[in-house]
A protein has these predicted regions:
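Juxtamembrane intracellular "pre-TM" segments in multi-pass secondary transporters
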Residues: 4-14, 194-231
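Helix-loop-helix hairpin linking two adjacent transmembrane segments in secondary transporters
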Residues: 143-191
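Helix-to-loop junctions at the C-terminal end of transmembrane segments
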Residues: 67-78, 276-290, 379
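Cytoplasmic helix-loop-helix junction between adjacent transmembrane helices
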Residues: 109-148
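Conserved MFS/SLC helix-loop-helix module at the cytosolic interface between two early adjacent transmembrane helices
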Residues: 64-103
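C-terminal transmembrane helical hairpin of 12-TM major facilitator-type secondary transporters
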Residues: 292-340
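Short amphipathic helix-loop junctions that connect adjacent transmembrane helices
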Residues: 36-50, 245-262
C-alpha cells in the first residue's frame, strides 16, 4: 500500500465504522427501551413470575435459529442487504408489540422481533471485514459501546416512558418509540451504510442458509480456539440473561423499585460497560490479549453476581450494595463481551467470519433463550436470590474453562 493511499484507506475504514456504530446504536437503543417494562407488562396480562420471563426467552429462541442464517447469508450476498432487512423488519416487530392486547400476541410480537433483529453476527462480520486482525478487539468494542449506550439511554427512557399510557394501555409507549427509531435507522442506513464485503471476497463454499445447520456448527467449533470460546460465551450469556430478565422482578419484590428506578440501574450498567469497552479494552487488549480479558471479566462478574444475591441481607445499605454489584457486573461484561468475538474472529478464515461469529452468537442466543426461563424457574421455585448466587458459581466455572482452554 502506498503512503498516499494508506490515509485514504484509514479514513474510509473510520467512516464505515462510524456509520455502523450509529446503525447498531439505534438498533440497540430501541431494544433497550423495552427491557424495563416487558416483565411488568407480562404480569399485567396475567403472567406469574416464571411466565413473565417468556417474552425475553421466545425472542432469543428465534434469534438462536436465525443468527446463523443471517450470518451465513451475509457471507454470500454481503452485509448491507442483510442489515437493511433486519432494521426494517424490527420496526414492524416493535409496533406489533405496542399493539398486542394479550399475552399470546405479546409473545408472537417478540418472536417476530427475534427473527428480525438476529443481526449482531452480521455487524461483527462487518467489523471483521474492515479491520486488520491486530485492531479487531478495538473494532468489536464499537459494538460494545453501542450496547453500552443503548443500555444507558434505552432502559432509562423506557422506564420513564412506560409511565404514560397509549390507547388506554399502560407501559406500551416504549414499544412505539422503538418502532419509530427503527424506521429512522433504516432510512439512515439505506443512505449511508456502505457494503463491507466486495463480491470477490464472498465465500464460494458457503452452504445453503438453513437453521440449525449441525455440519456448519461442527465446522466452526472445530476451528482451534473457537469451540472453547463458544462454550464460554454460552455459559456467560446464560447467567447474564437470567439476571437481566429477573432483575426487574427482584428490584420490585425486594426493594420496591419502579420501572423508572430499575431503568436507572440499567443506565448505570450501560455507563460502566461503555467506559470499559471504549476506554479500557482497547488499551488492554494489545498488551494482555483477549484471552486474559475474558478470564478477568468472568471472575469479576462471578463476584458481582454473588454480591447482588446477598444485597437484601445488608438492610438499609442493600440498595447501595445493589448499585455496586450492578457496576461490577457491567465492568466484567465490558471486558468479556468484546474480547470473546475478537478472540474467535482472529482464529477464523477470511471467508468464514460470518459463519464463525454467527455460530458464536447463535450459541449466545440459545443461552438468552434458556437463561430467562432458568432464571425465572429459580426465582419462582427456590428463592429470588437463587439466579444470582447459582449464577456466580456458573460464571466462575466459565472462568476456569477460560484459564484452561483459551490461549
Amino acid at each position: 500500500v502506498s503512503a498516499d493511499t494508506a490515509p485514504a484507506q484509514t479514513a474510509r475504514r473510520a467512516a464505515s465504522l462510524g456509520t455502523l456504530f450509529l446503525t447498531v446504536f439505534l438498533d440497540l437503543l430501541g431494544f433497550g427501551l423495552v427491557i424495563p417494562f416487558l416483565p411488568g407488562l407480562a404480569r399485567r396480562l396475567g403472567a406469574g413470575d416464571f411466565v413473565a420471563t417468556m417474552p425475553g426467552a421466545i425472542f432469543s429462541v428465534m434469534q438462536f435459529v436465525f443468527i446463523p442464517i443471517w450470518g451465513r447469508l451475509s457471507d454470500r450476498v454481503g452485509r448491507r442487504p442483510v442489515l437493511l432487512w433486519s432494521i426494517f423488519a424490527s420496526s414492524g416487530g416493535m409496533a406489533l408489540l405496542g399493539l398486542a392486547p394479550t399475552l399470546p400476541l405479546v409473545l408472537a410480537a417478540r418472536a417476530f422481533s427475534g427473527v428480525a433483529t438476529a443481526n449482531i453476527a452480521v455487524a461483527q462480520a462487518y467489523i471483521a471485514d474492515v479491520t486488520p486482525p491486530a485492531e479487531r478487539a478495538r473494532g468489536m468494542g464499537i459494538i460494545g459501546i453501542a450496547f453500552g449506550l443503548g443500555f444507558i439511554l434505552g432502559p432509562f427512557f423506557g422506564g420513564e416512558l412506560s409511565r404514560f399510557p397509549v390507547l388506554g394501555r399502560e407501559g406500551t409507549l416504549p414499544a412505539f418509540v422503538a418502532a419509530g427509531l427503527s424506521a429512522v435507522n433504516f432510512l439512515l442506513a439505506l443512505r449511508n451504510l456502505p457494503e463491507s464485503l466486495p463480491p470477490a471476497a464472498r465465500g464460494q463454499r458457503v452452504r445453503r442458509a438453513v437453521p440449525l445447520d449441525v455440519a456448519a456448527f461442527r465446522e466452526a467449533v472445530h476451528t482451534p480456539g473457537v469451540g472453547a470460546a463458544v462454550a464460554i460465551n454460552f455459559i456467560f450469556i446464560l447467567w447474564f440473561a437470567g439476571m437481566e430478565q429477573t432483575f426487574r422482578l427482584f428490584t420490585a419484590d425486594r426493594f420496591g423499585m419502579s420501572d423508572a428506578a430499575t431503568g436507572r440501574v440499567f443506565g448505570l450498567v450501560g455507563v460502566v460497560s461503555a467506559a470499559f469497552q471504549g476506554g479500557v479494552v482497547p488499551r488492554l487488549a494489545p498488551r494482555i490479549g483477549e484471552a486474559r480479558l475474558v478470564r478477568n471479566g468472568l471472575v469479576v462478574m462471578a463476584a458481582a453476581f454473588a454480591l447482588l444475591g446477598l444485597a437484601p441481607l445488608f438492610g438499609s445499605a442493600g440498595l447501595a450494595v445493589l448499585y455496586l454489584a450492578a457496576a461490577l457486573i457491567a465492568a466484567g461484561n465490558g471486558m468479556t463481551q468484546p474480547a470473546l468475538p475478537a478472540y474467535a474472529s482472529r482464529r477464523a478464515a477470511a471467508d468464514a467470519q460470518g459463519l464463525t461469529l454467527g455460530t458464536l452468537q447463535s450459541a449466545a442466543a440459545l443461552a438468552r433463550a434458556v437463561g430467562p426461563l432458568l432464571g425465572g424457574a429459580l426465582y419462582a421455585a427456590i428463592d429470588p436470590r437463587a439466579p444470582y448466587l447459582i449464577g456466580a458459581a456458573g460464571l466462575l466455572a466459565a472462568g476456569i474453562i477460560a484459564v484452561a482452554r483459551l490461549r
